[in-house]
Structure formats: C-alpha cells, structure tokens
Amino acid sequence: MTAEERKNLASSYLGKVVTIKIDRPKGFVHTKNNVEFTYPINYGYIPGVIGGDGEELDVYLLLVDEPLEEYTGEIIGIVYRKNDNEDKLVMAPRGTRLSQKEIAEQVYFREQYYKTEIDSLLHVSCGALVYRKRNSQREYLCLLQKHSQTYSAPKGHMEAFETEKQTAERELSEEIGIRAKFHPNFKKSAEYDISRGRRKKVVLFLTECVGEPNI
C-alpha cells in the first residue's frame, strides 16, 4: 500500500461512526522494541479493514475512562505517520470535537516516537489584532486575502503541541515578519460549522506593534 493509498483510506473514515474491537484496554501494558507502554486510553482496531502495515487499521479511543472490549463511536481525527508504514484513527463519543493539539496531547505516549501530522474535525486558527499608535489614535493592521479579496487579521492553523499564543506569535512572524506586544487580558474566540461535520475555532489576541519601521 502506497503512502497516498494509506492516507486516502484513513481520510475516508473521518466523521464516520464505526464499531471497534479493543485489544489494548486502558491500563494495558505493552512492550515493543524493548520499550514498555502503559496505555492511558483504550486502543483497538476496525475489524476487517487492513491498514498500511498489513494488519487491521488501529484506532485510539479518547474520552472514555473505563477499560472496554468494544465501542461504537465517531472518528474525529487521524494521526498520519510520516516515518512509518501505518496511520492511526482517533475515535471519541459521537458529537465530540477535539483540536489537533488536544488529540496530540492524548496520543503522545505512543506518537512521541514518530513524525506525525494530525487532522481533526475541529480546526483551530489563532492570530492577532495588530495595532499601532499614531497621533494618539490606534491604526489596525488588516491583510487583503488574494483569492477572496476580503480583509482579515493575520492568523493560521494551530500545530500539534503549540499553545494558542505560540500559534499567534508564529503567524505574526511568518505572515508579516513582526513581533508584537500581547495585551494580557484580551483573548476572543468563536466557533462555527464549516462542512461535513467539521467545525472551526478562531482565537484572536490583541497586540501592539512597537518599533517596527515597516508597519
């Protein structure tokens, strides 16, 4: 199975409700390559669906505290392994939405050994409202989006293991090449539906641009 075929297989399950068999329940101790793992979550597979490693497609089950043998839930995310021959699905109770960061934190006990990319039904974008003071007035920075011809604040997708503020700082650096002073008591967020069960969360901080001659 090629990497593209693997990715297409995993992606086809995002948002679907399926039943999994659990072969490593919460608390299970597993040893691989002389490394011992204690599973803090339930871990199983979709019967009859073969993944990239030639075995049944594996699934992390999140937000279910008790050890189980079987569970029916919604696939809310995918862990793509860039340096391995298999990917993992992420399941939770139906209607649950977790960000890439929240998923990454819960599967870190295994995925810390791999280079991974995480997709989820909840996409989080973080950025900043940037202003400068001129003649006792505030001037706010807006970016013109080339394709939509609309204006927006600088923002971008949160990456695994980033905080919201770290994402906003990175986007300011990447999009407009500045560092700004963050106001400690201002953070606003909003969530809305996109399509096919996906939601988006946008988080904005208030920042002041100081000492940037090009702004």
Language-model regions, residue ranges each:
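Thr-Gly-centered strand-to-loop micro-motif
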Residues: 47, 153-155
